[in-house]
Curated annotation (Swiss-Prot):
It is found in: Cytoplasm. Its EC number is 4.1.1.37. It catalyses: uroporphyrinogen III + 4 H(+) = coproporphyrinogen III + 4 CO2. One of its GO terms (cellular component) is cytosol. Pathway: Porphyrin-containing compound metabolism; protoporphyrin-IX biosynthesis; coproporphyrinogen-III from 5-aminolevulinate: step 4/4. It comes from Staphylococcus saprophyticus subsp. saprophyticus (strain ATCC 15305 / DSM 20229 / NCIMB 8711 / NCTC 7292 / S-41). This is Uroporphyrinogen decarboxylase. The gene is hemE. GO terms for biological process: protoporphyrinogen IX biosynthetic process. PROSITE patterns: UROD_1, UROD_2. CDD domains: URO-D.
């Protein structure tokens, strides 16, 4: 590919770069006027199941904001339907699961994903983007076992994860069987994304902050090790791990075979660096700040970028996803500022 911008890959490898790379979680989709126009005609399901539409939405932020990576426009629920999870995305609520997991028999009933058969539209989207000469690396992704399991057990989003924790503490056989099943599914799903052309994988563990260190280490970490090792043993592709409200788990994450540790806004780059975290750090502007006046945004950007430069390996991102209310011109201005301020 002509003039490919590999800044993000070079940063992760520790090679020289011309600037700090930038991308935004949820950069594709709801904050873009072009996407909102599409949503007037098509449902979310229709957009994600039509490769041309999905590739268009994935490509938009690279063109509009000049980001250093594209992130596949999909939902972490995508691979669950093919294995027998009756999931519906409800507006204003999120994923609702009509057949929650309660027993070992429910886990045993789950099927196995065959990406070419079950999610061809995901692979077709990636291939289209590759053929379209996308000039930045494409990030594929999967949900992490805990976050997926929490939806599957609770039946949807939860504040306290009571049913999930109850299963962990009272029915280890079912819990670990579910972990194994989700690890196998995620390895198969991400492998297919990589073979289709994804160059980076991000594992989203959005809700893992609900656990303390002891429980994470015992109930979750073995599955995370298996998942990340399963990807890394087969492919020379960097893996990013991101969780929300989980700074207390940073030490545990640092010993996983990941390449990049994504931080939310609660733990600064400087603090993470001082904990001897040796991974590339990603983050971590509070997405709410994108609704603030520019001088406030700029001041926070400088602090994060200075800390990132001091750490050595840093990818600029938000501490969570872009809100629908954020103006596209703000995201473009942030990208331009990051590129200019960190010019090497």
């Amino acid at each position: 590919m002509h003039n490919k911008n590999n800044t993000i890959l070079n940063m992760i490898k520790g090679e020289s770069v011309s600037h700090t790379p930038v991308w935004f979680m949820r950069q594709a989709g709801r904050s873009q006027p072009e996407y909102r126009r599409l949503k007037e005609k098509y449902s979310l399901f229709e957009i994600t199941h039509q490769a041309e539409l999905c590739a268009y939405v994935t490509h938009l932020p690279v063109d509009n904001y000049n980001t250093d990576a594209a992130v596949l426009y999909k939902d972490i629920m995508t691979p669950l339907q093919p294995i027998g999870v009756d999931v519906e995305i409800k507006s204003g609520i999120g994923p609702v699961i009509h057949n929650p997991i309660k027993t070992i028999q429910d886990v045993e009933k789950l099927g196995h994903i065959d990406p070419k058969r079950d999610v061809p539209y995901v692979l077709d989207t990636i291939k289209l983007l590759t053929e379209e000469k996308l000039n930045v690396p494409l990030i594929g992704f999967t949900g992490a076992p805990f976050t997926l399991a929490s939806y599957m057990i609770e039946g949807g989003p939860s504040k306290n994860y009571n049913f999930t924790k109850a299963m962990m503490y009272s029915d280890e056989a079912t819990w670990f069987a579910l972990m194994d099943h989700l690890v196998e599914m995620s390895i198969t799903y991400t492998s297919a994304q990589i073979e289709a052309g994804a160059q980076i994988i991000q594992v989203f563990d959005s809700w893992v902050g609900a656990l303390n260190v002891q429980d994470y280490r015992y109930y979750i970490k073995p599955a995370m090790n298996k998942l990340i090792s399963g990807i890394k043993e087969k492919y020379n592709v960097p893996v990013i791990l991101f969780g929300v409200g989980a700074s207390h788990l940073a030490d545990e994450w640092n010993t996983l075979p990941i390449d990049v540790l994504g931080l939310d806004w609660r733990l600064s780059i400087k603090e993470a660096s001082s904990m001897n975290i040796d991974k590339t750090l990603q983050g971590n502007l509070d997405p709410s700040l994108l609704l603030a006046p520019w001088d406030v945004i700029e001041e926070r950007l400088k602090a994060i970028l200075d800390q990132g430069i001091a750490h050595g390996k840093h990818i600029f991102n938000l501490g969570h996803g872009v809100f629908p209310e954020v103006k596209p011109e703000t995201l473009k201005r942030v990208t331009t500022f990051v590129h200019d301020y960190t010019q090497r």
